[in-house]
Amino acid sequence: MSGVVRTLSRCLLPAEAGARERRAGAARDAEREARRRSRDIDALLARERRAVRRLVKILLLGAGESGKSTFLKQMRIIHGREFDQKALLEFRDTIFDNILKGSRVLVDARDKLGIPWQHSENEKHGMFLMAFENKAGLPVEPATFQLYVPALSALWRDSGIREAFSRRSEFQLGESVKYFLDNLDRIGQLNYFPSKQDILLARKATKGIVEHDFVIKKIPFKMVDVGGQRSQRQKWFQCFDGITSILFMVSSSEYDQVLMEDRRTNRLVESMNIFETIVNNKLFFNVSIILFLNKMDLLVEKVKSVSIKKHFPDFKGDPHRLEDVQRYLVQCFDRKRRNRGKPLFHHFTTAIDTENIRFVFHAVKDTILQENLKDIMLQ
């Protein structure tokens, strides 16, 4: 009996040894595969880290209506991303809305300011326009907009409405209303599609966070626009991670205007207060902050007739001399900085002027790369 067992054992031993070798081989293969996968993951993570390190993330900050969204549109235009049909239709809807709402504001302001009509028959045009309501927030169709074009044209020609417009610092009126009303014959056509200039001047408050990605000399840029109204500012903190630079935008021409939110606070003072909070925040100690004093085209015109000294009594100089006003504006923001070791980079800009923004952003890009990305290796 024992001989039989020994014989069976000798027969089974090679089979067991082969199984052990196969198991060991499988384990070695699995280990090699695990090491390969680990190397692949490490390489992927390294590529992602390099990509994140190379990404230039620019945050656009500033009070409402300072020109952030217009600047972002310019980045799309300058870097070759055309607006598709859907976007053009949305801009058309926004432009119709800007015209109708702006004209209603002017009709209402004329009445409240006690300005008489030049032509009494325009009162019925005014009443027709004031009866317009779009409670559902639905887009205004071109055929519907055309019904209002005769009334809009007649009202815009009336000296009573023009006088109300000249006193627009006393109430809230969008800056693009004049441009659109001046171009009403073109915009009122049934087959109207917005031009690039129309798109730049279309005003719609930013809600939430809007991003735009583009590449310059193989360096990826991400530009982030966040709503500037007081109700939107709590969303700013969601965007602070990984910031390379902040472009802080100010409407330089609004020194005689108050906020839409409270109708008391001077708009320029509000911008200075926001800037002070941002520029002195420890989170941004190593972040370059570049000041854009925007709407230069409007500032040039306003300085001629509206004295900044009336609203800022500490102003020294000629209130109707552009260079004196510009110098004062830069000083106002510069005084808000506690860290005097870093320079304040600033530019006077006109966000609706593509060539101006192209030139300024070229300089800004160089500043950002020199100040914050000296370790970037261009491929």
Swiss-Prot record:
GO terms for molecular function: D5 dopamine receptor binding; G protein activity; G-protein beta/gamma-subunit complex binding; GTP binding; GTPase activity; metal ion binding; protein phosphatase 2A binding; protein phosphatase activator activity. Residues 290-297 are annotated as: G4 motif. A lipid is attached at C11 (S-palmitoyl cysteine). It holds the Pfam family G-alpha. Gene3D superfamilies: GI Alpha 1, domain 2-like, P-loop containing nucleotide triphosphate hydrolases. Residues 349-354 are annotated as: G5 motif. Mg(2+) binds at S69, T206. The keyword Cytoplasm applies. Residues 198-206 are annotated as: G2 motif. Guanine nucleotide-binding proteins (G proteins) are involved as modulators or transducers in various transmembrane signaling systems. Activates effector molecule RhoA by binding and activating RhoGEFs (ARHGEF12/LARG). GNA12-dependent Rho signaling subsequently regulates transcription factor AP-1 (activating protein-1). GNA12-dependent Rho signaling also regulates protein phosphatese 2A activation causing dephosphorylation of its target proteins. Promotes tumor cell invasion and metastasis by activating RhoA/ROCK signaling pathway and up-regulating pro-inflammatory cytokine production. G proteins are composed of 3 units; alpha, beta and gamma. The alpha chain contains the guanine nucleotide binding site. Interacts with UBXD5. Interacts (in GTP-bound form) with PPP5C (via TPR repeats); activates PPP5C phosphatase activity and translocates PPP5C to the cell membrane. Interacts with RGS22. Interacts (via N-terminus) with NAPA; the interaction promotes CDH5 localization to plasma membrane. Interacts with CTNND1 (via N-terminus); the interaction regulates CDH1-mediated cell-cell adhesion. Belongs to the G-alpha family. G(12) subfamily. This is Guanine nucleotide-binding protein subunit alpha-12. It comes from Rattus norvegicus (Rat). The lineage of its organism: Eukaryota, Metazoa, Chordata, Craniata, Vertebrata.
